Amino acid sequence: MLTVFRHCAGWFVALSWLLFVVTVPICLAIGATAGVKTLAAPKASACGYVTDLIDKASPGPLFLPSYPTVESGPLHGAAYLYDNAVAAIALVGCGERDKADRIGAAILWAIDNDRTWHDGRLRNAHAAGVVANGSAKLPGWWDNTQNKWLEDRYQVGSDNGNIAWAMLALLSIDDVSARSRFRDGAARLGTWVAQWADTRGTGGFTGGTFGHEPTPDVRTWKSTEHNTDLACAFGLLAIRTGDSRWRDMATAAEHFVDTMWDPACACFAAGTAEDGVTRNPILALDAQVWPLTALPGAAKKFASAITAVEQRMSVDEGFSYGEDRDGVWTEGTSQMALLLELLGSTAKAKSLIAVIESQRSPDGGFYATSVRELPTGFMLDTDPTKPRLYFRLPHLGAASWAALAERGFNPFTATKGLP
């Protein structure tokens, strides 16, 4: 995943006019009062946890907070688009389509009610909560030192991979026989992404935009993960609408992913550099697992990627984000568990589910990682001197992928099967 801040941009936040570093202490609940033994209540299923998040909210279209326990700073009240899209798909897989509908309705609201853009794009994050009248709110925080309201440059941008996930969410919720508003919304998002088709190198789609309006930076790198997402989203949109132009875009994105395969290492490159040609050799777990889960025939064609992942990225019975193997990445371990389940490796999948369950937070959610800080191998877009990290915080994305793995539900097909 090349220079993509899918959900957590870390505590290092670049503002539109300066670089600003936010340091927030992380405090974890350890247990009951010293000397008193208590019996822990049984945890709800991952599906039950995500469903409960919806049930506890006020009625109406809704974005869920990505990091619900964070009380201040850039992550407080931030509802990352990717996390919410995965949550919506997980709810469909859990048999809770009506609850997924609430997130889908919020996505449609955000398309129509951005404070600046009216061209079919979405932001990487919106303010968590029930959407209200007026412009769709964006996350931010008050800085007492500067006496200003601040916004994160990544959160206000528009990554094409995140928008692809929003498309997948809308198409998962869509009832083909009864209504079209969700697939119409997916088509609007696809139309915005289409402008980023690239002719350099092996084609595909570039990254999207980064930073504030009116002139955000254009991201000219290309991501294997993004193009996997887009190949699937465009392909599903072609099926749902019967419009062949979406099939052409799906083919272009899938071709790019195919060319990122390196037989020598039995792995996919993360994508390209800004020139659109030079490969980024970083090994990222999702860039290995997602093509096999999402693309027709890929699980067989690139089966050796599973061995490469097991040999180079396994840690503590689970999987890390990259080759550093400093700790378990809960979300990625769920992705691997799901793939193995879909391939029929049930025993291996169940052993990974046990690892995922070990990362439960006190509220029944799931920590993003087993360690305080988990490196990804990438650097922050907002400050290239700082590493991009996952933190040991309860995370909506981790819980949603745990639910998908629990149900054996493929978010790329909205079924319990491979494409």
List each model region and its residues:
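Loop-centered beta-sheet repeat module
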Residues: 218-266
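Alpha-helical scaffold segments of alpha-solenoid architecture
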Residues: 266-285, 289, 293-300, 310
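Low-complexity, Ser/Thr/Pro/Gly-enriched N-terminal "stalk/linker" regions
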Residues: 30-156, 176, 180-183, 187-216, ...
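Residues in the short coil linking paired helices within alpha-helical repeat scaffolds
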Residues: 96, 182, 243-246, 345
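Active/binding-pocket-proximal capping segment
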Residues: 351-359
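A beta-strand-loop signature enriched in Asp, Gly, Thr, and Trp
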Residues: 302-335, 339
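Well-ordered alpha-helical segments within folded domains of soluble proteins
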Residues: 77-93, 100-101, 158-174, 221-238, ...
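N-terminal Sec-pathway targeting helices
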Residues: 3-21
